[in-house]
């Protein structure tokens, strides 16, 4: 269980990286007693969205259109480079110990990133839980 004490906004949050269980206290008073008031904000985000994908393999191939999915990211025509592993590691290094999760996204299925396994591993090595949503079009038995 990871625990974070936000002294500025006077509350405590805890997160279990194995199960995803998350809990936080209400704002505590000057005596350390929970007031029951929901904290408005935290000093550092507990979940951060990181766009690691610059293009969509499935969108560019027309697979999404064939399956009846309309792409809101214009995946059929847009092609930018994916975030480098080096840049991703810099983000993780800046966030470790301050955030619980990174929501991986961008333009395309994150599981198609050329460094997907390394991205997941680096997050876990630094006690940050990676999460992502995928169309599943690129999933294999592995």
Task: State where each predicted segment sits.
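Short loop/turn motifs at secondary-structure junctions
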Residues: 67, 98-99
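Flexible, acidic/Gly-rich N-terminal and inter-domain linker regions that tether
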Residues: 1-49, 66
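Short glycine-rich loop/turn motifs that provide flexible caps or phosphate-binding loops at active sites
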Residues: 19, 104-107
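Short, charge-rich amphipathic segments
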Residues: 13, 47-55, 106-108, 114-116
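Canonical Radical SAM [4Fe-4S] cluster-binding loop centered on the CxxxCxxC motif
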Residues: 39-86
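Hydrophobic faces of well-ordered beta-strands that scaffold small-molecule active sites
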Residues: 48-50, 100-104, 130-132
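Residue-level recognition of conserved structural "scaffold" positions that shape functional pockets
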Residues: 27, 33, 58, 113-115
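Canonical radical SAM enzyme core domain
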Residues: 77-93, 108-142
